[in-house]
């Protein structure tokens, strides 16, 4: 027998805010929805049931759900202006995990669809509260390890009778903003803001536990990262832009690449009504092995500054694959046409996450750099692309930083300090932690090739960063600047995560009420060898390189494209299509001034403008089972 909820009734304990509320207000973007009977977020139990939500719309409207496999619309799919009930049917959630469904409404005359509410359906195995795990696992760890444990203990009165993830969230919120370094403000494309904590807890399976160690995690699906983009002010012209594909993934083998724009999936045209659902089912959620997907893709046409009318069909079949974080690498060598002895070589690597299981892939890239250095005589610059890198394992960060630092990481025969760590006062006192407790750069004690063996005499290190660049990525910038390396930041302001996590789990202590957990609280703040850690608002791009607000952040070409030429009004014009182009051009201007060389390059003043109507749309942020790095974690994992 299904349980029937009527969310128009106020006073229910699981509703997170006042029941009846309007969406549009004097200071809010207009949505066309003036009333809804639910909070922004609600929770329901795992049993099969129906949920009814009442809305009032100003004009004709249609309802959508983010995943029709989890919930279906059985009443109120559309209507005219007025007040209506929307009924969603949920099947029983017999999995180990909670699952999320978002209800949307698209109102006639309003460009963007509006989020009515996000519904979390607990697993039937969850009894409504997790008092045991809250009392005996989460809270003791917070009391001992959390960086703001003193403030948490002073606040006291934890609410044990909650779901395990809600317990953590309410505990952290209880001392906000004292712990404001534990999180960031997320702003959607419609201007809605939400605070997101870095600290997190997950209910896991034994498979998930292995991700905290240096073992390669295997995934199933196509292996492509996408987001929605519109070239039209009314947001009706929707494509899924391919940001990147993992090497050797099914998508890569099928020919899908960065710079492709997906217009159809299995014959269905992508629109503002279905892009969210199609993205979830084909690229965000794991796809069963053997599933075939046919895409119609196009590329950006630099002559028309619009998507090309020519399309290509790509068919790919889901399989298992590894997420190698080294997405692309290359070496670019330029020779002056006026003096052939004048050469400069530039190494380029796109690194997506600090994953210790793939440190050997970093070594392979630097082997390629070393080969180029031996052939040309030098490798003068390196461009490290961290635009999508939200962090990861500190040991991997330490290794890559050592490779980049070379001999500058040494003080005589001894390695310099890579990082100082500050823990909470209780741990500092009890454990004798002080500023003399530090981590050095890797030297010849590294269990692979000695990090200093390459010793590239880089004149300058360019780092490409964005607001997604966080944690260990920022640690690398801070550490290298701390020993005097010239690091130039290109792109946008970074995330600002100068704190890190230690990952705890129940694998050794045993299951709690039949479940295992991974808990990653913020436990330390990081400083470079100069004692600097003042980047909680992010690192600001260097002068002339603040580009994130421009269109170079869109995937308009494949990786490593230097410049693009096109015909405009009968004349040849040049474009710098990416952050990489700007970094490369800056290097060439230094090495080959116009008066001394005719090396092909361009000046920013000649860079033609890109179309103003290009706009990125919000996409779902879904954590997969086992993906512990999803919230920009620094992981002190063995």
Explain the meaning of each model-derived region:
Residues 32, 38-41, 58-87:
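Surface-exposed binding patches on compact interaction domains or structured appendages
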Residues 86-88, 97-109:
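A short beta-strand micro-motif common to beta-rich folds, especially ectodomain repeats
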Residues 91-98, 287-289:
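Surface-exposed, short loops/turns at beta-strand junctions within beta-sandwich domains
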